[in-house]
Amino acid sequence: PWENNKNISQKKRAFYQYYATMLEPWDGPAAILFSDGDVMGAVLDRNGLRPSRYYITKDGRMILSSEVGVLECDPENILVKERLRPGKMLLVDTVKGEVVDDEKLKELYASREPYGEWIDRNLVQLSGLKIPNVKVESYTGEQLTRLQKVFGYKYEDVNTMILAMARAGAEPSGAMGTDTPLAVLSSQHPPLFNYFKQRFAQVTNPPIDAIREKVVTSTSVYIGAHGNLLEDKPENCKVLKVHNPILTNTDLLKIKYMNVPGFKVATVSINYYKNTSLEKAIDRVFLEVDRAYKEGANIIILSDRDVDEYHVTIPSLLAVSAVSQYLIRTKKSTA
């Protein structure tokens, strides 16, 4: 992505950074064509997973398709034979009778507003936040073991997965079969996470991850109120940029106690008394989130700390999903 591209101009970098605060990344595979009747354009996903080739002929035609040969064309009539490259755009202006290439097109739009100034004044980096004068929570071996049991970690998970990742910084490789039943068919009580599988657009290649495909992936996350995509203004990029979604205790404290104009952080517990129904517990979380929103919070931390023998926690996957859908349903959030 643009973050790893050292060859783009500062204007384009600021342009991409500005819109990254409002747009979710997309990996494709997709070749998108668009037109308003006067101009026609095409853009390819940044991984280049969908082929897109085009001809420009001497008699003023452009032919673009995922494959060569969809239309018969005399080779002697071909002026340009090219392909749309990963993450690139192409624009045909039929009024002016010209083809606008990726570089010119993006420089044009990147120069419309002072995006660099807007980013400098509004975007907040997690790495730039001060560490609060608060003790960072640590755990004894006994406390850690108890927490692992609470959150469903097995001895095998810790030793074959977590320990290996901590040592190597990557998932361990394995090629053994598994006779573990699907979560929905299991006679045990698997964690809620086990009921869900990653969805991705598979063509002929495996899922893309940020370790093996660093050149085309980013792990940055933007936290805060999303701006209006249809209205360019400085306040749109008033968000907190987190470079990695896996947060340390220090990172969480920096967010919890951040003192930056335009940001207000609230913490809502997702723990509940063990004799309470899960449905009532989620409704109580909705009420607390709603109260925090009305008090001006634009960052909400859902906390499962302080679990004990009398309290259990709503699975974090369920809690985050439920709160997200509640905020969308009540028109307090757009995504």
Please annotate each region the language model reported.
Residues 1-31, 37-42, 54, 263-335:
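Glycine-rich phosphate/ribose-binding loops and adjacent secondary-structure elements
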Residues 19-20, 134, 236-249, 326-335:
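Short, surface-exposed, charge-dense and proline/glycine-enriched linear segments
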Residues 1-235, 248, 256-259:
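Conserved short alpha-helical segments that host acidic/polar catalytic motifs at enzyme active sites
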Residues 232-276:
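Domain-start "cap" segments at the beginnings of catalytic or binding domains
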